[in-house]
Every structure is written in C-alpha cells, then in structure tokens.
C-alpha cells in the first residue's frame, strides 16, 4: 500500500465537480417511486458537526435497477432518474438529497439486497474516501439483507439504518454519519 503525506488528503479538488448547480435534487416531478428526502449531518470523533463535507450517493431506481450499463436486469429504467447525487454540507452542517426510495436489488448467490443507498464521504483531512450504506428503518427486507447481516454487532448494524420521519408533509429519512468515536458509522472497503 502506498503511503500518504499530509498534503495528499482526499479531495474534492476539481471545480468541475463542484458547480453551484444543485446536484442533490435527484427526483423530478415525473420520477417514478416514493419521493423521499435523505438528510443528516457528518460528525468528527469529538462529536462536532463538520462544515465542509462532500457526500455522494448512488442508488437503484424504484424498480431496483441501476442506471448503469452493467445492470442487465429486465426491470424498467426510469429516464427521469439518474440514481446519482452530490451534496455539500450547508451552514448548519447538513447534507440532503431529494430522491426516491430505491427498490431491492440482486445480491451475490441469488440473494436479494434490501433497498439501500450507497454513500461516499469526502472531507478535509481524510486520507481516503469513506464508503457506507443507508438502509431504511421501515424495511422488513433489512432482516435478510446479506450486507447488513455481515455486520455481526447489532449495535454497529444500527449505524447503517436511517430513521423515517415526516417534515412539512414529506417523508424524511435522517441519517447522521459519525466518522469516529462512539457509534462510529460502519464503513466498507471498496
């Protein structure tokens, strides 16, 4: 493994990927599926919210199909849904995405993965990106998801589950990310 130096922390460095155009609005009026908002904050090891974090997500559409050439499923594609978004944290250190609840996707060995969102976190001072997942608290399929069940400690497993709520008549899932310390979010090697 190559060694990192302090000046080689993870980006974001390239302005082309950091336009002022909102990249967190993933669900349009005609996007198929249940419209949801995913929001939260990112905390450091001392429990302080971090102000300058970039959160990227990618997910399947409501049918459980990714908008990617390698997804060869017979499920429909939704032309109004790319399945990808990016959000920087705001003045109150919140990130948010307006999206849809994804459908279940195939796993390895003929298993089915519960609806989930894949997440990549980039922040000042991090030497590598951190990857995690968001599962949904109201999904029965979580009980048999092979990735979620690979986290043997149930307390740690809960760090991957967003809590369903409602705000202004809309469905909101709250998912806080803890980079270190008590209740550190489970991260995956990618």
What are these regions (language model features)?
Residues 1-190:
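Beta-strand-dominated extracellular/periplasmic modules and repeats
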């Amino acid at each position: 493994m190559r060694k990192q130096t302090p000046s080689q922390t993870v980006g974001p460095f390239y302005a082309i990927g950091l336009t002022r155009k909102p990249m967190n609005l993933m669900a349009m009026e005609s996007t198929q599926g249940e419209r949801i908002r995913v929001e939260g904050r990112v905390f450091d090891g001392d429990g302080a919210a971090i102000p300058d974090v970039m959160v990227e997500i990618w997910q399947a559409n409501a049918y459980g199909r990714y908008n990617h050439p390698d997804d060869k499923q017979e499920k429909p594609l939704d032309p109004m849904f790319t399945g990808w978004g990016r959000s920087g944290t705001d003045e109150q250190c919140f990130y948010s995405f307006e999206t849809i609840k994804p459908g279940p996707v195939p796993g390895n060995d003929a298993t089915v993965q519960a609806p989930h969102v894949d997440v990549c976190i980039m922040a000042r001072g991090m030497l590598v990106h951190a990857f995690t997942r968001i599962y949904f608290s109201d999904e029965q399929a979580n009980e048999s998801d092979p990735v979620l069940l690979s986290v043997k400690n149930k307390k740690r497993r809960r760090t991957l589950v967003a809590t369903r709520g409602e705000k202004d008549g809309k469905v909101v899932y709250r998912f806080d990310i803890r980079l270190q310390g008590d209740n550190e979010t489970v991260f995956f090697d990618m």
